[in-house]
Amino acid sequence: MEKTKTSPLSFIKKWCYDKRLYFLVFFLPVAIMFSAYAFFKIHPIGDSSVLVLDLNGQYVYYYEQFRDAFHGNGSFIYNWSRNLSGEMFGVFAYYLASPFMLILVLLPRTMMATSILILQLAKIGTAAVTFMFFLKKISVQKPKTISLIIFPTMYALMSYMVVQLMDPMWLDGLIYLPLICWGVHRLVDEGKLVPYIVPLALMFIAHFYIGYMVGIFTFFYFCWYCLSREGRILPKKFFSRCVAFGIGTLVALMCAAFVLITVYNSLKLGKFEFTDPDFSLATQFDFLTFITKLFPMSYDTVYPEGMPMIYCGTAVLILVPLFFMNDRITMKEKTSTGLLTFLLVILMLSLIHI
């Protein structure tokens, strides 16, 4: 029997219809953020601009250099316009390695401020999409549509995301993290390495600095999932999964080695001399003050003396107690989740001052 051929247009229409919830989740936080920009008269609505602090005094010039190099008017390796000239790859790896940087090369150089705004909104929307993907994949039962809309929106508009829009290179961590955590689930449940290796390697390539922090959290998440998942993991299987986790992490690092090794050599040229860590025990802030950051309108500063940016919606204040009161959630899941939360809070207190 002859199969009916599907036209490309029909295929695209069907694909868009099937993925309509992903499109909604992408554009909802984007629309909210753009509305906030419009309210504050940010260009192109008003005369203000997204170019603030380091984004205005430093990053935008790197972006222009990146765009010029992409169009053949410069180099990704060496830059003669730096003070007395200098290598460029270290700058590229820290500020410019994100795939979202391609947005800046598609629009004219005169529209740089608009390009950066689009880049910011694209990262917000993509973070919501990857988080929704994660929720759909890990849910035992089919999640409700409203949950797949609300929680990704809260994730994409958490205070860290909004505040760090002025440091857009740091936002890739929120995009790759749900994919990496899903990879951890696949590794523990099925022993598959590729879903874990690929997003982790991409994270290290996109931004090595945020990448190592994501890697540390991934280790904690791996331990949490092994302890909290349904069904007991036999010691032999647990050991094999730990070995697989270590191998997968090593392979991801090797995949990103062309960036990591070059960055290390770049830092040896001078950046290491600016670090003066103090490993004495010290707390950065009062715990009660820390609690206030769970509420809206609690932003203080982006400077080191500022508090952690942990606000992700007032619903959390209700849902967290309900989680621990829910009888359908096992005690081992509550215990492991409580331990992980406690560990993260302790780490944010920064007992070792660096």
Label every model-predicted segment.
Residues F26-Y37, L317-P321, V345-M348:
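Hydrophobic core of alpha-helical transmembrane segments in multi-pass integral membrane proteins
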Residues Y37-I138, K142-P178, L202, A206, ...:
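Active-site lumenal/periplasmic loops and adjacent helix-entry segments of GT-C-fold
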Residues M1-I42, V243-F245, T249:
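Start-transfer (signal-anchor) and selected internal transmembrane alpha helices
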Residues V30, I124-K137, K144-V188, K192-S228, ...:
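Membrane-embedded helix bundles of polyisoprenyl
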Residues I352-I354:
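Conserved small/polar residues in nucleotide/adenosyl-binding loops
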Residues A36, L107, K136-S139, G183-D189, ...:
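Structural signal for the C-terminal ends of transmembrane alpha-helices
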Residues L53, G57-D68, P99, K237, ...:
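Periplasmic/ER-lumenal interhelical loops and adjacent helix-loop junctions
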Residues L21, P143-L148, G191-Y196, F245, ...:
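Membrane-interfacial loop-to-transmembrane alpha-helix junctions, especially the N-terminal start
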